[in-house]
Amino acid sequence: MHLHRTGTAYRCTVLVQLSGLPGSGKSTLAYEIANAADFVVVNTDVLKSSLIGSGVDVSDAGAATYAAALGLSSDLVAQGKSVILDSPCRYRDLLEGGLSIASDAGVRYAFIELWVPNVSVLLPRLDARTSRISQVASATDPAPGTTWEFGTAEATLGEWQEQLLHPREGWLRLDATHTKAANLQRALEYLGQQHH
């Protein structure tokens, strides 16, 4: 078990998979946890956008992104860093990869999912954010080089949410329509951190 010092207390290294739909607040929550509790964020949108920006075709960038994210997360955990893997978790390989990294390294595994009771609440959020090249551009425009997989933004987001995977037990679902502060507090409590 990796231990490192935070203030005057030691705590264990943790690998957190943070999942949810585009616009659900995953990255915001990931960075808030990182700032409050000394975690490193591995953001798949940053990795995928970098790959696409360097000339990798959109259709090939997904698998390469997840492989890079898992490899980077594994390396950081091996260095004793607590990691938040910020990515929608719709693929079994990604879920199993995170579980495997934690198991192989002998560190705690945690999983947090941001869920929305009605995906229509995400549409204004998508319009309001500044998106990266790999991300859904707005409520009317999918990620560049792609189409809405199920015809419309709302239908696609609804299907994507149903496809989200999580471990069988020991995970936390947060309502993405709750306040950022409330979700941060619940996440930190789940992770065993105190937010001051």
Can you name each region flagged by the protein language model?
Residues M1-T8:
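Pre-Walker A adenine-sensing motif
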Residues L15:
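Walker A (P-loop) ATP-phosphate-binding motif of ABC ATPase nucleotide-binding domains
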Residues L18:
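Hydrophobic anchor at the beta1->P-loop junction of P-loop NTPases
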Residues L21:
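P-loop (Walker A) phosphate-binding loop of NTP-binding proteins
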Residues S24-K81:
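Conserved substrate/cofactor phosphate-moiety recognition/catalytic segment
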Residues Q79, A105-A110, P167-W171:
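Short glycine-/polar-rich loops that comprise or flank the Walker A/P-loop
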Residues A105-D127:
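Conserved phosphate-donor/acceptor-positioning beta-strand/loop module used by diverse small-molecule
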Residues S131-R186, Q194-H196:
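Small-molecule kinase domains that catalyze NTP-dependent phosphoryl transfer to phosphate-bearing small molecules
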